[in-house]
Amino acid sequence: MDFYNHAANILSDLSKKKGSIKQLAFNSKKHDPKRTYALVCETLKYKPVLDEIIARSELLVLEKKLKENLARVLVHDLLMSKRGLSISNGPIKECILRHKTRLNAEFVKLKVKKGVKSHEELALKNPVSLPRWLRINTIKSTKDEVLQGLGLDKVSSIEELGPDKFYIDDCVENLIAIDPSFPIVENSLYKEGKVIIQDKASCFPAAVLAGLTGHVGDIIDGCAAPGNKTTHLAACFPKSHIFAFERDAKRVQTLRKMVGISGANNVTIEHQDFTLTDPKSDLYRNVTHILLDPSCSGSGIVSRQDYLLGNEQDVTEDTERLENLCSFQSTILKHALQFPNCRHVTYSTCSVHRLENEQVVCEVLSQEPDWKCNSLTKTLPNWKTRGIPEYCAQPSMAEGMIRCKPGAGGTIGFFVANLYHPQREQETFKMYKNDDDTKKRKRKKKKKEVKKKARIQGEE
């Protein structure tokens, strides 16, 4: 009985916005979290149906001590679970079984009324269906090997995806989409780290940096755990050394595991707060690129279960929490811009809020006038949705920003700003151009000397 009370309490906590389904289900070690999670999701999936059956049977009128959410989970398992009610004999079981005939009758009537044969047809449908994105880990594999290993048929759009189909993304290199029903976690490609499950939008920061021209030295990932973006950087820049910062001990372990699975041997994990590093340290003198994805509200994250919560889970962000997040985001971005040889920085969040996105970038750039937003042509031009000009200090800044709307284009809600230091970029260009010119002159001179030597030897 404790199990059903626990599930009912989670339903109550969800209505009070005390957490997500997953958080609440997996917080308790007393009950099987997977079983709890499944029952809560299934109950929510059929909530309108269960409520109608309970109302028409007058269950709560006749059993005044029975609470609404407990009635929902019990009636769900009585009518819809293959194993039925998993409950020992007692008052609650007797209470439900007393009304079994009436509940079953109302269930049958409802199916007839709706014109369906099975209860599955009565379930709530998810209006936002995201594909599962797989990043091909080029450290360990190739596109050809992965596609052959999946054994799926190619389609030309994510809308055409099905259990036996895949789609090659046209915006991010080495990224493919598959249907969520495909059992990828059981596939050897996933187990061996040859493919990494990573949302398309989450691939944008590293993809933006990879699309830039010019010299690339060392790279910093300032908020690295769980490691998807870090390992993406490692794959995009195999000749660069990557410093991956994470201050939380548990998340460091997650990061180490992810880096290990990916096979990235050009990553150094730094268990420390990135904002406490000394930008002028010799250790970071070769850093030219920085990727920042700091803590945020997560308001853009689309869970596959969000639709089950309906309007009950519409999030009105706590103003104080948002302000604290924005303060931290501004601090870490300002810190990143202090590295003396850094030329490119991407700042990203999985938030849809102006405060955490355009406002943070504009505020920091107003204090760091040597830094600018990059151009559209250097910021994944294939992705059409940019920053919001009205939110920017100068409308043109929006071109160097990327926005993703939750669910649109198969992504979560996301934001990326592509920042650069024009003077340092130009100086680096000149320096490496001069080096190239010097090398060319030396090669030319050497060729002349070789020819001259050969001619002299021929004359002798």
Curated annotation (Swiss-Prot):
It is found in: Nucleus, Nucleolus. It catalyses: a cytidine in 25S rRNA + S-adenosyl-L-methionine = a 5-methylcytidine in 25S rRNA + S-adenosyl-L-homocysteine + H(+). The keyword Cell membrane does not apply. One of its GO terms (cellular component) is nucleolus. Belongs to the class I-like SAM-binding methyltransferase superfamily. RsmB/NOP family. Residues 430-460 are annotated as: Disordered. InterPro entries: MeTrfase_RsmB-F_NOP2_cat, MeTrfase_RsmB-F_NOP2_dom, NSUN5_7_fdxn-like, NSUN5_RCM1_N, RCMT, SAM-dependent_MTases_sf. Keywords: Methyltransferase, Nucleus, RNA-binding, S-adenosyl-L-methionine, Transferase. Interacts with trm112. S-adenosyl-L-methionine binds at residues 223-229, 246, 273, 293. It holds the Pfam family NSUN5_fdxn-like. Its main location: nucleus. One of its GO terms (biological process) is rRNA base methylation. S-adenosyl-L-methionine-dependent methyltransferase that specifically methylates the C(5) position of a cytosine in 25S rRNA. Residues 430-439 have a biased composition (Basic and acidic residues). This is 25S rRNA (cytosine-C(5))-methyltransferase rcm1. Its EC number is 2.1.1.-. The active site is at 350 (nucleophile). It comes from Schizosaccharomyces pombe (strain 972 / ATCC 24843). GO terms for molecular function: RNA binding; rRNA (cytosine-C5-)-methyltransferase activity. Residues 440-460 have a biased composition (Basic residues).
